[in-house]
């Protein structure tokens, strides 16, 4: 793909950010939240945990994929920053090491800060003497029975260690020679143990407890040295869809295989490890020096989520103030089905409650007038009320069709479980589509009303997950629009059968049309700007990687169209480059909630065109996923969306802008402090409070209403 605009070559690598390095920049912005002292202390620790969890997935998928390319001898540069796989791996190591060093520096600072609240993370030898019997009892009865030391010699080869498992390497003097052993720490027991003395709480990590009592595992030998290490394995494996007679069985095979993928990262607690032992482990695991990370602290800081939960009761004032999602402004106290017959209903989670969406499916399942329910599910919670409602609907005799996407990465096992359960309840379950992931969020309820069928459609930007709906920002719409209803019916028929691509009235569906519509809308904005001088595009998404769309945005910028991009994560476009992207602005917001909604706005000379979507402007969303882009035609809802995006562009507390070199900086100006997420929480709470007051205020009846009331009373007495 080569694109010139006049004498400008738009393909030059200096105009682009590499996808993987841009993702690392995003994860650093997550780490910045752990460095932000305006966040409560326990929340700062939580952000360190999120940073680690993100990084695990990055290595299991993205780094693993690059390593596979290098092993196969593939050295073609990617199509934007034009880095080969090997060059990307080198730069990932350099950037990630720098960021991880900052992570551990901040971790150690925060652990030190906990001391002022009478909480200390210590080694066993630092525990007060009178608590040592309790420690010994915990080890003897709660830990030791779960451990299996694995000696390594000619008769005992190096064990196949599980992905993300925590292990202790042990050097043992056996008189004749020095041998090695591995102690794998079971994942199903607690990572830390708490000991109390007065107001003081001592926390000891399980690896430190095992190390303290290590001689009990190797009785009769001398332990010379120990250190902890952790392996991350390749989870970017191929699901063989073509030859699979039953995709459920194939997914289960794939899940077993993924646990034992090749090692892609070795993390070592560098405080005790020796060079000789590290070289030995590297050879056993067949990893390269570039894959080894030494850290100054405990491994796997995802455990901080559990630690924060453990400390939350005692130190709840060191967490965010609890926020309860409010009744949606667009819904108020109305019944969702009654109101949607009159107008579209808009939802903005988590500021507004996800409960009405749960109720939407539950009420449909219970209503005897409901004929059919159809829904796509990508990620749902472990105890999903929506799943329960779909089961109930099928058991109540309604026709229920559910597409459960079995290939939703790291949710495959959960989704296999739900697929089986739904089938047992009598639902017609679709496992997805060959070589595509169904990422769209749509639910269709068909009811018999007044002797005719009426369709109610929910379309959203986020998953039908009642848990993540409290921490992800997402949007949704419920409508009874006849054209969208027809589209929804055709869409589900496409998913459930062998029908070719349907024709749609209003919905725009990938992998067929979303990219083409984006390109056409941008072209139209360029044309409009040349004619009217007011071209403007605002896009909000998680990530931007698709080169066709980036090139078209460059064209728009060169034509003078103002382009504002609100992109939380990966952004392969560099804004502000003179003559190329000088009219493009990129802002990223990382805060309390994960920004997840996708909004696409085209000014269209004042006749605004606004879409919501399940899709980011990423190549995978354009060609490898089934996605839905849907129009927002209600003027009041459209205004809310525009106001929302302008609010986010004004965020000078959690907003960062990207400069022409691809670097991100906090937005600093002389305006009043504005945290867009905090603003929206307050706005929702104010509405909720006003609604509550309106409901409790005595209602004053009109004269006619009073007459009607007295008439009813007289009739009662006549009876």
Curated annotation (Swiss-Prot):
SUPFAM superfamilies: Phospholipase D/nuclease, PHP14-like, PPK N-terminal domain-like. The keyword Cell membrane does not apply. GO terms for biological process: polyphosphate biosynthetic process. GO terms for cellular component: polyphosphate kinase complex. It catalyses: [phosphate](n) + ATP = [phosphate](n+1) + ADP. Residues 434-468 form the PLD phosphodiesterase domain. Keywords: ATP-binding, Kinase, Magnesium, Metal-binding, Nucleotide-binding, Phosphoprotein, Transferase. Mg(2+) binds at residues 379, 409. CDD domains: PLDc_PaPPK1_C1_like, PLDc_PaPPK1_C2_like. The active site is at 439 (phosphohistidine intermediate). InterPro entries: PP_kinase, PP_kinase_C_1, PP_kinase_middle, PP_kinase_middle_dom_sf, PPK_C_dom2, PPK_N_dom, PPK_N_dom_sf. This is Polyphosphate kinase. It comes from Staphylococcus saprophyticus subsp. saprophyticus (strain ATCC 15305 / DSM 20229 / NCIMB 8711 / NCTC 7292 / S-41). The gene is ppk.
């Amino acid at each position: 793909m080569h694109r010139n605009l006049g004498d400008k070559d738009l393909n030059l690598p200096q105009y682009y950010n590499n996808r993987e390095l841009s993702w690392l920049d995003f994860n650093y912005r997550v780490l910045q939240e752990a460095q932000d002292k305006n966040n409560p202390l326990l929340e700062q620790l939580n952000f360190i945990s999120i940073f680690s969890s993100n990084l695990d997935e990055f290595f299991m998928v993205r780094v693993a994929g690059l390593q596979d390319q290098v092993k196969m001898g593939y050295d073609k540069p990617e199509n934007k920053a034009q880095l080969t796989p090997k060059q990307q791996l080198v730069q990932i190591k350099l950037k990630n090491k720098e960021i991880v060093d900052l992570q551990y520096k901040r971790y150690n600072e925060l652990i030190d800060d906990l001391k002022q609240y009478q909480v200390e993370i210590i080694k066993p030898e630092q525990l007060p003497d009178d608590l040592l019997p309790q420690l010994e009892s915990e080890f003897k009865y709660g830990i030791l029975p779960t451990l299996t030391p694995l000696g390594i010699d000619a008769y005992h080869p190096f064990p196949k260690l599980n992905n993300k498992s925590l292990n202790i390497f042990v050097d043992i003097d056996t008189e004749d020679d020095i041998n090695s052993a591995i102690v794998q720490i079971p994942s199903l027991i607690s990572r830390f143990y708490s000991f109390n003395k007065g107001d003081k709480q001592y926390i000891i990590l399980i690896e430190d407890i095992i190390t303290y009592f290590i001689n009990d595992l190797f009785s009769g030998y001398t332990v010379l040295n120990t250190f902890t290490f952790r392996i991350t394995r390749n989870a970017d494996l191929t699901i063989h869809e073509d030859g699979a007679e039953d995709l459920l069985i194939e997914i289960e095979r794939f899940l077993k295989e993924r646990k034992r993928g090749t090692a892609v990262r070795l993390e070592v607690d560098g405080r005790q490890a020796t060079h000789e032992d590290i070289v030995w482990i590297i050879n056993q695991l067949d990893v390269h020096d570039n894959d080894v990370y030494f850290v100054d602290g405990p491994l796997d800081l995802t455990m901080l989520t559990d630690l924060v939960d453990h400390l939350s009761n005692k130190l709840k004032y060191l967490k965010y103030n609890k926020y309860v999602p409010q009744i949606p402004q667009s819904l108020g106290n109305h019944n969702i089905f009654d109101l949607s017959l009159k107008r579209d209903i808009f939802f903005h989670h988590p500021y507004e409650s996800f409960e009405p969406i749960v109720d939407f499916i539950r009420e449909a399942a219970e209503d005897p007038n409901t004929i059919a329910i159809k829904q796509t599910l990508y990620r749902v919670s472990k105890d999903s009320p929506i799943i329960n409602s779909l089961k109930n609907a099928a058991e109540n005799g309604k026709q229920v069709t559910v597409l459960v996407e079995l290939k939703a990465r790291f949710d495959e096992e959960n989704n296999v479980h739900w697929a089986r359960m739904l089938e047992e309840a009598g639902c017609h379950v679709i496992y997805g589509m060959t070589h595509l992931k169904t990422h769209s969020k749509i639910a269709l309820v068909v009811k018999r009303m007044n002797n005719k069928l009426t369709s109610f459609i929910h379309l959203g930007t986020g998953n039908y997950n009642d848990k993540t709906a409290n921490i992800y920002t997402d949007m949704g719409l419920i409508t009874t629009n006849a054209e969208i209803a027809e589209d929804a019916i055709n869409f589900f028929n496409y998913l459930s059968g062998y029908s070719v691509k349907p024709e749609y009235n209003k919905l725009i569906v990938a992998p067929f049309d979303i990219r083409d519509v984006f390109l056409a809308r941008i072209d139209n904005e360029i044309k409009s700007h040349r004619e009217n001088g007011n071209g403007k595009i605002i896009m909000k998404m998680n990530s931007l990687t698709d080169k066709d769309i980036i090139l078209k945005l460059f064209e728009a910028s060169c034509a003078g169209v103002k382009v504002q991009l609100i992109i939380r994560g990966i952004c392969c476009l560099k804004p502000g480059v003179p003559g190329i992207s000088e009219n493009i602005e990129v802002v990223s917001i990382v805060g309390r909630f994960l920004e997840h909604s996708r909004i696409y706005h085209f000014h269209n000379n004042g006749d605004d065109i606004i879409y919501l979507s399940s899709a980011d402007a990423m190549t995978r969303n354009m060609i490898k996923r089934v996605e839905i882009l849907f129009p927002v035609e209600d003027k009041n809802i459209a205004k809310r969306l525009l106001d929302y995006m302008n609010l986010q562009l004004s965020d000078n507390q959690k907003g960062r802008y990207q400069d022409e070199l691809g670097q991100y900086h906090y937005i600093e100006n002389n305006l009043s402090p504005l945290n867009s997420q905090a603003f929206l929480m307050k706005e929702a709470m104010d509405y909720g409070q006003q609604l509550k007051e309106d409901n409790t205020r005595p209602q004053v009846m009109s004269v006619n209403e009073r007459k009607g009331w007295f008439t009813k009373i007289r009739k009662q007495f006549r009876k």
